[in-house]
């Protein structure tokens, strides 16, 4: 890591890590990378349950040890030894269940910095950590997802953030909350201001990577400066792909087409006034069952002025009354420049372009130059690496394969967005910079649907959450613009000031934490068949070069031949690990969000088999209708866990 990325307190000079001093943060990283490289050569190390699928090179490129490894983290024991406090039965610990219902929105800038399927607002988790822990305590999240528990643990040391939760903090760092009894209110002490340390792990490489980006301090201004330099370099490679002619004549279009055909990086500004593409609308093309004529969905089915898609519409060729279900998509075969083989996909054509000239926006129907430029970008391959992993079999992955023939990761991107993303990715030399790739790589794809809002086609829009669904009307955003937007949002990380978390990539069942070493755990585990994480994460993980090992994924899935009972067994094994790691008498909070009684019964059984006892149920409103379950580790008697 360049020292300029670190927070101002560590910007240059010696740094301390796990009790040892290093000349610089870069020296620290290089030292631990060498140790990790040696560890990766150990066959037994790679046998740890949940070890991701990836090369040593890719794992090392992503990792920032000891704080984060894109594989099982071999430095967790060192972290606990350095920061943890041994269990002492003579030290009193008596915390009552946290009875208050919690409501926290999901609109905090830090919460929105990087997308992920399910996220608990870190401000909500802070309330639980403050209730059950003291400054410096170790907090575990064994299903860490995007790492909100780590953020919450660290921000318990931020006076301003703690006070924003409605608490009071006195000059000595005592935290008070308001309580009412018999109509009288008073402020009672219940915690202390101070950061807690966290141990985060997740089976998914992209989840642990996002957790790393959230929990790693950086100088946001220097980070943005470096990222903007990379973006400028990438735009020099592919900026030409997002130009369009403004009010061209027929002659100018013809001249532009010739320029596009003859030049590898055509500059159309010499032909006509040009604009920069904001987004392009793509439409499915169907075949009429009566005359076999082409039916462009946008042209035939969409009521442009009314802002709706008609259920019934006429064939433009024969006039037959059609519905979307009565037609079949038109397919075509072409040479895939990345696979080097012929593939077959559903036809989608550009039907509208939104662009700007200066600061003014315009819309147009694609002209001959636009079609030729798009054709060029779809058929070329640059020297920059792009993920071409084949989609695994699954519930979510089946839809894009069957509907549009998208069989590999790179198929989810238009030619120019694929080239743009690859160009930026190739120039990111540190994993923190690659977080900008993952910020856009799942969302800015052919999953992004066109919508009609406030009287305008193209306003709003987005992908369907929890799916890989490809809509019939796709809004292709300018990837360079989206990367620029991602860079501008990095200011929200200013609250993260120190490396108080250690992050591992592995299954909960395989993690090795010394018994009786954790002070509190907050987890948000998968629930039955709610979300197929490994399938949805595949696009993201393709870009970082590390894929989830699905064997130990705790879900219910026909594609993986995992029944509800298999899910229960996997959850039991994972919860046993959490149980063993917790100090006696300590607490774990488990959030759940599944309305199926059978799934909840399976979870209850898993909890009981792991040794937990339910103490309280309370609502956790994150504007998604979910709940949490509070549990307590029983006090041991004669060394036996009851």
What are the roles of these predicted feature ranges?
Residues 568-584, 609:
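A short glycine-rich, Lys/Arg-flanked "PGG" loop and its adjoining helix->strand segment in the class I
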Residues 1-67:
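Intrinsically disordered, low-complexity linkers and terminal regions
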Residues 521-522:
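Hydrophobic beta-strand segment of the Class I
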Residues 146:
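Conserved SAM/SAH-binding loop
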Residues 586-592:
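Conserved beta-strand signature within the Rossmann-like core of class I S-adenosyl-L-methionine
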Residues 46-142, 150-514, 533-560, 574, ...:
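Nucleic-acid modification enzymes, centered on SAM-dependent nucleic-acid methyltransferases
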